[in-house]
Every structure is written in C-alpha cells, then in structure tokens.
Amino acid sequence: MQEKAVVLDDQMIRRALTRISHEIVERNKGVDNCVLVGIKTRGIFIAQRLAERIGQIEGKEIEVGELDITLYRDDLTLQSKNKEPLVKGSDIPVDITKKKVILVDDVLYTGRTVRAAMDALMDLGRPSQIQLAVLVDRGHRELPIRADYVGKNIPTSSEERIEVDLQETDQQDRVSIYDK
C-alpha cells in the first residue's frame, strides 16, 4: 500500500474540528438539547475533541457517547477465534430520546457505517433529530446519506484508501490517501 499524499496535517485537522464545532453550535442555537455520539473507534476521539471545543465556545459541557455498531453492519466480519463478532459495547451516558444526536465519524464513504449507526441509535431511544459530522467525506455513496458537518471533502477513486491517524490511537494527527 503506497501513500500518495498527506491531505490533512495536525493543524488542518484542528482547524476543521474547530469550524465544525462552531457550525454545530450555530445550527442548533447552542447545545442544550444535543448529544455527541462517536462511532467506534476514531469517531469517539473526534467526538471528544468536538465536545472540548464546544465547551470552550459555549462555556458548558455537551454529553459524549460511544456507539459500537458491530452487530448492525450488513457486511459483518467475524474477527474472533470462535467466529463470533467482536463487540465492544456502546456507552451513551444520557437518554437520547427527544435529543438532537450528532453522530461523529472519521470518514464518510459508502454510507453503510452511518446506516448501521442509525439502526443502533434507534434501539437505544428515539432522538428528535440525527445529524452527522465527519472529518472526511470521500464520496462514493451507496446509500442516500449526507453529512451535515464536514471537515474536508476529499474526492477519491475507488482504487484509493483514506487513512485517518489520530493522536489517541496512532500517536499523530493526519489524513492520508493511499493506493489500494
């Protein structure tokens, strides 16, 4: 797998997340009825960073939850020795019923992850609204799903891969394009 280009460095990621945070506050007229829910794994860390910035902007905390969509995927891959799916569990600290839930993920591609996340959310409650925030939108949708907040649109070919590295998991912040 050959790296073609670094499309976002640490400063660009920081700026994109700051902009998304402002957009979330502006669109929702504050964050009183909002919950950020990160899709495991990198979506959680992005959601936590957004919550930190929103806290700085608004002077109040926004709840952050973690969503494991393993059992909701239509392309479930079995990753354990006994052929059972590896489930890490969801952790959403508040009832999402009648809340504005902002789903957070690192990359929006086919839309299948987001569809699975919406199914998982509906099993946990009935939000008044679901919004989507992603660091990168790379196109190639297979489902009618569109992000409300996008850090950067990066058009790619189907022969390319986007790799998101975050400090929390990869000891650096950057987004790169690779040839498959």
Curated annotation (Swiss-Prot):
Domain of life: Bacteria
EC number: 2.4.2.9
GO MF assignments: RNA binding; uracil phosphoribosyltransferase activity
InterPro entries: PRibTrfase_dom, PRTase-like, PyrR, PyrR_bifunctional
Gene3D superfamilies: 3.40.50.2020
Motif PRPP-binding, residue numbers: 101-113
Alphabetic keyword roster: Glycosyltransferase, RNA-binding, Transcription, Transcription regulation, Transcription termination, Transferase
Name of one Pfam family that matches: Pribosyltran
GO BP, sorted A to Z: DNA-templated transcription termination
Catalytic activity: UMP + diphosphate = 5-phospho-alpha-D-ribose 1-diphosphate + uracil
Function of the molecule: Regulates transcriptional attenuation of the pyrimidine nucleotide (pyr) operon by binding in a uridine-dependent manner to specific sites on pyr mRNA. This disrupts an antiterminator hairpin in the RNA and favors formation of a downstream transcription terminator, leading to a reduced expression of downstream genes.
Sequence similarity: Belongs to the purine/pyrimidine phosphoribosyltransferase family. PyrR subfamily.
Subunit field text: Homodimer and homohexamer; in equilibrium.
Record protein name field: Bifunctional protein PyrR
Lineage: Bacteria, Bacillati, Bacillota, Bacilli, Bacillales
